[in-house]
Amino acid sequence: MNYIQTEIDGVWLIEPKVFHDARGYFMEAFKEEEFRAHVGNVHFIQDNESKSSFGVLRGLHYQKGDCSQAKLVRVIKGKVLDVAVDLRKSSPTFGKYVSVELSEGNKRQFFIPRGFAHGFLVLSDEAVFTYKVDNVYAPQSDCLLYTSDAAD
């Protein structure tokens, strides 16, 4: 896999090596040892999947405090524009964002560390989106970032 550090520290774009032949393709979607060597010691505890139609905007969600989640996201069907916004107040990139296109064609993955809001917009007729998280969902800590929110 090719690990690409984005312009925001801790946010990674990961490009798997895909092997094609007459039968289709094969790729390793996740290798814990390799992931930790590049990204750090993140222990994923759950995999989630969602299906959405064209034009659906999911997010920008985040969980506060100890309930914060790191995510490793990818698209297995369709195409999305995926966005991570830095909410770490002590970060020099606080309020900045990274956006990437994830699709079944490019097979890229996007790692978003704790302390970020995350969301995506579906660009294809439908998209199946899957992601690993390192913490359980805590509804009492769930927040939604709106485009009109002040960056403070």
Where are these regions (language model features)?
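Active-site scaffold segments
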Residues: V128-K132
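Hydrophobic heptad-repeat coiled-coil signature
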Residues: I112, D149-D152
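Conserved metal-binding segment of the jelly-roll/cupin
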Residues: L102-S124
